Amino acid sequence: MTKVSVLVAVYNTADYLPQCLDSLLAQTMTDIEVLCVDDGSTDASPAILQQYVERDQRVKPTFLKENTGLAHARNVALRQATGEYVCFVDSDDWLATDALEKVYDTFEDGVDTVLFRVVLHFTDGREKEYKMKPFETLTGEEAFKESLTWKIHGVYAVGR
């Protein structure tokens, strides 16, 4: 069984998609699958995905004919996932090279969900860290309530 399935919903992000995919394929943890669901993009995103499929068999695309929305695209990818754990990444995100290895190790310690530190990178070169709550263990109900007020959100991974 694959250790981590990375689910990437793609919609008109040709300008960012290569950096996203490069960051996923450069992970120190190599036992991953990258499930990309193109949600009816009208830009070069489908062609970019096809280029990556030819370079690396871990990239597994699905092409939807029309835009059905983020939730549907993620659900399509989730149904295809074979990993022990799943990580949701937007197609304009990129991860540090050891991110998935750290996530996997954290799951092996018995947690249910991992939230990532988020740093926003702007096209003019500025960076801004998204301020989230300091690390703590929350129950599912507490985490849900915190997410409603945007105190926690971002890139995340969950156990299956």
List each language-model region with its residue ranges.
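Nucleotide-sugar donor-binding/catalytic module of glycosyltransferases
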Residues: 1-160
